[in-house]
């Protein structure tokens, strides 16, 4: 029982450490996902959750996500935006 609890705790911690926050980034087009402040929150949230994030919102005309897996391409700044 203690082993199961310890393994579960480790998996939760690993998931928390490997999660990243940032702007969704399209490597092929080399740009961040475009949105319109406030009205784009639903689309950003949906796109972020599709990529494995916990939630997303529109910030500086680009989709910002929280809790993305470490393998998801992100940008730390909004930069050049594009429609994906």
Swiss-Prot record:
Domain LCN-type CS-alpha/beta: 20-83
InterPro entries per UniProt: LCN-type_CS_alpha_beta_dom, Scorpion_toxin-like_sf, Scorpion_toxinL, Scorpion_toxinL/defensin
Leader sequence segment: 1-19
Tissue localization of expression: Expressed by the venom gland.
PROSITE patterns xref list: LCN_CSAB (PS51863)
Main location group: secreted
SS bond partners: 31-82, 35-58, 44-63, 48-65
CDD domains per UniProt: neurotoxins_LC_scorpion
SUPFAM superfamilies in UniProt: Scorpion toxin-like
Subcellular localization: Secreted
Keyword field: Disulfide bond, Ion channel impairing toxin, Neurotoxin, Secreted, Signal, Toxin, Voltage-gated sodium channel impairing toxin
Pfam family, one: Toxin_3
A GO cellular component annotation in the UniProt record: extracellular region
A molecular-function term among this protein's GO annotations: toxin activity
Top-level taxon of the source organism: Eukaryota
Family, similarity comment: Belongs to the long (4 C-C) scorpion toxin superfamily. Sodium channel inhibitor family. Beta subfamily.
Domain remark in the UniProt entry: Has the structural arrangement of an alpha-helix connected to antiparallel beta-sheets by disulfide bonds (CS-alpha/beta).
Function field: Beta toxins bind voltage-independently at site-4 of sodium channels (Nav) and shift the voltage of activation toward more negative potentials thereby affecting sodium channel activation and promoting spontaneous and repetitive firing.
Protein name in the entry: Toxin CsE9
Source organism of the structure: Centruroides sculpturatus (Arizona bark scorpion)
């Amino acid at each position: 029982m203690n082993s199961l609890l310890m393994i579960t705790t480790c998996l939760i911690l690993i998931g928390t450490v490997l999660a990243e926050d940032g702007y969704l980034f399209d490597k092929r087009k080399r740009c961040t996902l475009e949105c319109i402040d406030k009205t784009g929150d639903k689309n950003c949230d949906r796109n972020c959750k599709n990529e494995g994030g916990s939630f997303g919102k529109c910030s500086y005309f680009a989709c910002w996500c929280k809790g993305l897996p470490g393998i998801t391409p992100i940008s730390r700044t909004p930069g050049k935006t594009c429609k994906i």
